[in-house]
């Protein structure tokens, strides 16, 4: 299997508290925090998803003393990258100056766990020695800020985990409940086919 060598994270400077949301939504800090445990969320102003992911990735690499050229794979879990193509993982690979394969994983909120499972498969087949797993989103740009059932849940940020050979994680068991009635944020419409 693999072990975690280091981590990194990045949040935008702006944040919005539940009390601030209650000034324009029919809600309160108590209502939100009792149901979600969330008291505030970080929101991008000028920062991009690429900015956040790059900061988190560099932090994880620096903490482990690993150069980008030593990476064997970059996986990026995101609900919606900045581009249709290239993948968000490839954008970060270029920003870091890495030369390894890079791909996105799209599995909504559980994307990071799915990315870990993909990494576990590469480690099990002895195809990699160092894998950078990233997760990040800028959901504040997608949610309807008038819909209290969704906007109170999401913020912006990025995290990174650098994985290396070793034994720490014993197994991963994945499952899914694919009911869009549980939580649904529709894809924004465009004029393109």
Task: Write out the residue ranges for each language-model feature.
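Condensing-enzyme catalytic core mediating Claisen C-C bond formation in acyl metabolism
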Residues: 1-46, 147-193
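Acidic, glycine-rich active-site loops and adjacent beta-strand->loop/helix elements
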Residues: 10, 77-82, 107-112, 135-140, ...
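Short loop/turn motifs at secondary-structure junctions
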Residues: 65-70, 122, 127, 168
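Flexible, glycine-rich active-site loops centered on histidine and acidic residues
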Residues: 124, 128-158
């Amino acid at each position: 299997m693999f072990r975690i060598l280091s981590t990194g994270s990045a949040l935008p400077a702006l944040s919005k508290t539940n009390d601030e949301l209650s000034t324009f939504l029919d809600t309160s800090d108590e209502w939100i925090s009792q149901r979600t445990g969330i008291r505030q969320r970080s929101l991008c102003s000028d920062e991009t998803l690429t900015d956040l992911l790059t900061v988190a990735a560099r932090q994880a690499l620096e903490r482990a003393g690993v150069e980008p050229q030593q990476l064997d794979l970059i996986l990026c879990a995101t609900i919606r990258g900045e581009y249709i193509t290239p993948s968000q993982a490839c954008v970060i690979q270029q920003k870091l100056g890495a030369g390894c394969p890079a791909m996105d994983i799209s599995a909504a909120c559980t994307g990071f766990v799915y990315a870990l499972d993909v990494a576990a498969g590469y480690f099990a087949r002895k195809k990699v020695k160092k894998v950078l797993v990233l997760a990040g989103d800028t959901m504040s740009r997608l949610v309807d800020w008038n819909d209290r059932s969704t906007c109170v849940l999401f913020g912006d940020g990025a995290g990174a985990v650098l994985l290396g050979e070793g034994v720490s994680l014993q197994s991963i068991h994945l499952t899914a409940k694919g009911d869009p009635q549980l939580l649904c944020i529709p894809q924004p419409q465009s004029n393109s086919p």
